Design a protein with these regions (language model features):
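Catalytic centers of hydrolytic enzymes
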Residues: 1-212
Length: 212
């Protein structure tokens, strides 16, 4: 979803995309056993068709993409908010595109983000750092729920630009880029990496598996 947001608005200068996990209500993979109550087509081995109904199951709220230019410090505030409730399961946890970052789950909420780096065209982390200070600025895409302060994210309503409905943005991206992979890489090459400075004494990082 965030890849779709970033790619769609990259021509307008968008560098990163962030959405809250609570807005993603399903995934785009289908079970091997057919279920007439879901939106999956009859099962075939991957790559398999993705239906409009599946996209709407993932994004059922009708959220709209917004774009806004923020400072690096504001971006850090967003990332800090996103991991502030970890290891608890919380809808504010961010899904990102265009950047990868590392946070220390043992540190106090608000001071957990250690570093962030840009990703390349394939989604791999690069050595190019993201400047998380007030002296830098980045244009991002997010959803209108977050823009209005939902899930504790900073309020950017007064300076954000309203774009298109997220489900349509995602559907158009899938159509243009199929076949697509349903997974992103896990630690240590993933977009969001958890460190635990308490080590074995407090193994609170999530399981190191790939995510949809």
């Amino acid at each position: 979803v965030t890849d779709a947001m970033r790619a769609t608005y990259a021509p307008t200068g968008v560098e990163f995309a962030i959405t809250n996990s609570g807005g993603l209500r399903a995934d785009l993979t289908c079970p091997t056993t057919d279920n007439p109550s879901d939106f999956c087509p009859a099962y075939t081995p991957p790559p398999y068709p993705i239906t409009r109904g599946q996209v709407l199951t993932v994004l059922p709220f009708g959220n709209i993409v917004t774009t806004v230019t923020i400072s690096g410090a504001e971006l850090k505030t967003m990332l800090e908010n996103g991991v502030s409730r970890m290891p608890a399961v919380d809808g504010r946890f961010p899904q990102v595109s265009g950047l990868c970052f590392t946070y220390d789950i043992a540190l106090l909420a608000g001071s957990r983000v250690l570093s962030a780096f840009e990703t390349d065209s394939t989604g791999n982390c690069t050595a190019t750092p993201v400047d998380l200070t007030a002296t830098s600025s980045y244009k991002i895409a997010e959803n209108d729920f977050m823009t209005g302060g939902g899930d504790g994210y900073p309020v950017f309503s007064s300076r954000a630009t309203t774009q298109d409905i997220m489900d349509q943005v995602t559907a158009d991206y899938i159509t243009a880029n199929s076949p697509i992979s349903p997974f992103v890489k896990a630690f240590p090459d993933g977009r969001i990496n958890c460190a635990d400075s308490n080590g074995a004494a407090a193994p609170n990082c999530p399981a190191l598996t790939a995510s949809p």
